[in-house]
């Protein structure tokens, strides 16, 4: 018979934001301190993830923070013509401030403020929860540019993102600004059903994991947002139950899954072996488990 509307409505509600806002403010102040080694350089600090996109649920506590240095940038030149690539190479000036040094300086800034609560993870610098302060994952990043045209510094076109390096030294580029902006536009175009439906899927995922029906880590929130981002606007509306059924039917019977995109519209949503796309098998495992739970409720 499906999951009752009352349950879906409960799942659709946004979690508390007061503690996360306070945590973000504390982390941001530490990163923007005048005592940091990167003070005076051009950088920005912003929220990403569930709190940044208003898709957080009650069970969530981690706050995702990005510090991005704009004085140095990495580039993707694969879309440039040979002539434009030559022009880029002639204009390029190597940076003297390395990513490794910047991340170390960010680590020092956080350690200066939070002491032993700070640890380096594979991708993020983790600031442990303490008292009313929530756990924060801080990504130290540099500007990233995917170039489409380069005739000179004042005659170029590129999509701007961020990039960072994981523990294995692999460069990971992403586009949080585009993700957030596109998600908000889609939310408005869907008559404001999108973000509550993301929260429904996230709570459903939590229940699947708690019930032993889905392995933890297979369905990150970022990809659930991406999945619903692809669903046509007319599939949203009337009730959460209708939204769920219409979305799942569209994904399973109408969508060309190879053409689904991430909400940033820079990467395909389903792709094998990358840090920026959802493994197809993981996506199928979540979708199948979600439909099964719906049918057996």
Swiss-Prot record:
Q: What does this protein do?
A: Cyclic nucleotide synthase (second messenger synthase) of a CBASS antivirus system. CBASS (cyclic oligonucleotide-based antiphage signaling system) provides immunity against bacteriophage. The CD-NTase protein synthesizes cyclic nucleotides in response to infection; these serve as specific second messenger signals. The signals activate a diverse range of effectors, leading to bacterial cell death and thus abortive phage infection. A type II-A(UA) CBASS system. Cyclic dinucleotide synthase that catalyzes the synthesis of 3',3'-cyclic UMP-AMP (cUMP-AMP) from UTP and ATP, a second messenger for cell signal transduction. Controls the activity of cUAMP-activated phospholipase CapE, a patatin-like lipase that is a direct cUMP-AMP receptor encoded in the cdnE operon.
Indicate which residues the UniProt annotation says bind ATP. 48-50, 202, 221
**A GO biological process held by the record:** nucleotide metabolic process
Q: Which family does it belong to?
A: Belongs to the CD-NTase family. E01 subfamily.
Q: Any extra remark in the record?
A: This is a complex CBASS locus with the loci capE-cdnE-probable diadenylate cyclase-capV-dcnV1-cap2-cap3.
- Can you provide one Gene Ontology molecular function annotated for this UniProt record? nucleotidyltransferase activity
Name of the gene: cdnE
* Entry's pH dependence statement: Optimum pH is 9.4.
Keyword flag Metal-binding: yes
Query: In which domain of life is the source organism classified?
Result: Bacteria
- From which organism does this entry originate? Escherichia coli
The molecule here is called: Cyclic UMP-AMP synthase
- Please state what class of enzyme this protein is: transferase
Cofactor comment text: Binds 1 Mg(2+) ion per subunit.
Q: Would I find Transferase among this entry's keywords?
A: yes
Q: Which reactions appear under catalytic activity for this entry? A: UTP + ATP = 3',3'-cUAMP + 2 diphosphate
Q: Which positions are annotated as binding Mg(2+)?
A: 62, 64, 137
């Amino acid at each position: 018979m499906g999951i009752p509307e009352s349950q879906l409505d409960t799942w659709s509600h946004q979690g508390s934001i007061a503690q996360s806002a306070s945590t973000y403010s504390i982390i941001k102040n530490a990163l923007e301190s005048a005592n940091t080694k990167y003070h005076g350089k051009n950088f920005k600090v912003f929220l990403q993830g569930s709190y940044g996109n208003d898709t957080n649920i009650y069970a969530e506590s981690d706050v995702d923070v990005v510090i991005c240095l704009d004085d140095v940038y990495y580039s993707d030149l694969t879309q440039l013509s040979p002539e434009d690539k030559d022009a880029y190479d002639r204009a390029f000036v190597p940076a003297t401030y390395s990513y490794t040094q910047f991340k170390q300086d960010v680590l020092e800034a956080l350690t200066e403020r939070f002491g032993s609560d700070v640890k380096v993870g594979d991708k993020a610098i983790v600031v442990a929860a303490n008292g009313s302060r929530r756990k924060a994952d801080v990504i130290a990043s540099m500007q990233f540019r995917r170039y489409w045209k380069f005739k000179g510094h004042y005659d170029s076109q590129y999509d701007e993102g961020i990039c960072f390096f994981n523990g294995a030294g692999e460069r990971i580029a992403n586009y949080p600004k585009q993700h957030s902006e596109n998600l908000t536009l889609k939310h408005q175009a869907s008559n404001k059903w999108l973000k509550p439906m993301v929260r429904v899927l996230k709570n459903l995922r939590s229940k699947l994991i708690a019930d032993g029906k889905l392995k933890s880590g297979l369905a990150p929130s970022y990809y659930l947002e991406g999945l619903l981002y692809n669903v046509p606007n007319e599939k949203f509306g009337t009730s959460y139950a209708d939204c769920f059924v219409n979305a799942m039917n569209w994904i399973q019977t109408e969508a060309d899954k190879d053409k689904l995109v991430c909400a940033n519209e820079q990467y395909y949503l389903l792709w094998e072996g990358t840090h920026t796309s959802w493994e197809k098998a993981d996506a199928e495992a979540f979708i199948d488990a979600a439909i099964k739970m719906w049918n057996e409720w």
